[in-house]
Amino acid sequence: MHADLGVQPDTVRRSELPGGVRLVTESVPGVRSVALGIWIGIGSVDETGEQAGAAHFLEHLLFKGTRRRTAAGIAEEMDAVGGELNAFTAKEHTCYYAHVLDTDVALAVDLLIDVVTDAELAHTDVELERGVVLEEISMRDDDPEDLLGDLFDQTLFGDHPLGRPVIGTEESIRSMSRETLHSFWRGEYTTPRMVVAAAGNLEHDRIVDLVGDALAAATRGRGEARSMPPRAPTGVRPVRAGALGLQPDESEQAHIMLGVATEGRYVHARPVLAVLNAALGGGLSSRLFQQVREQRGLAYQVYSSTVRYADAGSLAVYAGCAPERLGEVVAVVRDVLGEVAVDGLTDAEVARAKGSLRGGLVLGCEDTASRMNRLGRAELDHGRQRSVTDSLARIAAVTPAEVAAVATELLSRPLTAAVVGPYEALDELPVSLRDL
């Protein structure tokens, strides 16, 4: 693992364009595609109560047409070259992206910038997409695991914006006006908040020219504006340790997430927490998978995950099981977390976790879309790029003692839990959940 298996120092280039748009590219020889994304440093945490779900609503709406293109025209242009066009919204950012052949990168640049900067937002389209978003909320409500994720965030982060679902609520979407959406778009989708990331068979200077030409017609955010720095923590600690949330659901399984809040992404060294997470529940050999599924057969699916935002994050365990076995699952998970908090992980567990992270990182570099995502997130979150070689070295440097220290710090905290399943009230849940 000593060779540079990913980003070479001279293949990632960065430019800042007039208006404050940041452009980061990575040349990947030997491929015939380019993945290109326009990242906006705006997500659901930036919404007011009235705007809840606006960032995600806009993600749908911007594809409905611009002054130069109809919705059908947008789809036809991309289909005609066999490309992919899509978008996603998260708590702290939104990304509009395309994946095309290298010969069609000019089309991808023009189309994406047109969609992001010159959308129509017609009243009829707002009403049409309102119904689509409401259907998406219904789909979320019919998927216990998706519903659980939102419930856990709400239970852990409470009234902080991190606790709100990205998709919004049925009430907020039904009441959201075209004026609210237009104001959010005009006020937040400014060029200093934009990052253009591209990876594949490309030339940086050509992408600079294409993006600059496409942005020349934009009517806002030009001039001497400078790019915005990475999102800073607000100083608010959005934590409700020991809370328990329940969403009754007539499902055959009980679905549970339990975990703890972590500090924001600028506090803990990311590789240490990532190693801890991988060893706890990141794979088939992980401590939780072995204890819950392999040795006791209590659940088909069990894993841990970690997310990091500017203000805070979480380290959480998910499991789905028969309702009558929920108490036993919770007891085993709590025992595992308690053991790791006190005794740490074995050297072998740490070594396997580090190997898993190394392999996942390098394998992800074989995909131009993954590389583009890495570029965009790094620029938005940190304002800099870190080579894969550097990332591999940081993973390799993690020691069992460092992992043990973070495990003791985090896993000694009171657990927060959320449950989706066939229970009507909190007092129907197992005692092992009610004494967190």
Predicted regions and their residues:
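Histidine-centered active-site/metal-ligand motif
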Residues: 56, 60, 204, 255
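A conserved active-site cap/scaffold subdomain adjacent to cofactor or substrate pockets
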Residues: 265, 272-282, 288
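N- or domain-start disorder-to-order transition segments that initiate the globular core
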Residues: 1-33
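Charge-rich, well-structured scaffold segments of protease-associated domains
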Residues: 10, 16, 27, 71-227, ...
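M16/MPP (pitrilysin/insulinase) zinc-metallopeptidase core fold and M16-derived inactive scaffolds
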Residues: 30, 35-99, 282-298, 309
